[in-house]
Amino acid sequence: MVTFFKFNKNRINLLCGDLNVSPNEDDVWSHKQLQNVVSHTKIEREKLIKIMNKGKFIDTTRMFISPPENVFTWWSYRSKDFKKNNRGRRLDHIWVTNHQSLESLNAKIMIETRSLPQPSDHVPISYEFNLG
């Protein structure tokens, strides 16, 4: 992956998906309680941030939703009322390189899909941009 982005560094690159890591304290419901839990351990967070920095990626969601506001894309099925408990994590990401050549319009987390019948434990995220 690093090699691909190294050889394509002058292009606009998107990396998106379920990366299964919540890199920032604001990406989990309780940093203190989850710092030793898979998806938010120190080593996972450091490695993901290293990949982001090495690839010169920008976190599109955080372009529009700034810390300290929590951003979650995943809630456990164990919670009967995910909205009330709101014990989520942000495991899904959309990153972009060379964003200065894009007109960034919007990023959205579609939380309402988690309330559908038989939902996924993840909710979709979107990033809207104009290539010019």
What are these regions (language model features)?
Residues 1-96:
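Metal-dependent phosphoesterases centered on the DNase I-like endonuclease/exonuclease/phosphatase
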Residues 27, 105, 117:
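Short acidic, gly/pro-rich beta-turn/loop elements at beta-sheet edges
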Residues 59, 94, 106, 124-126:
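Generic structural signal for residues positioned in beta-strands
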Residues 62, 96-97, 109, 129:
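Hydrophobic side chains in beta-strands
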Residues 72, 106-107:
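Short linear functional motifs in flexible/disordered or boundary regions
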Residues 100-103:
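Short helix-loop capping/hinge motifs at secondary-structure junctions, enriched
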Residues 108-132:
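Surface polyanion/phosphate-binding segment centered on an Asp-His-Pro turn
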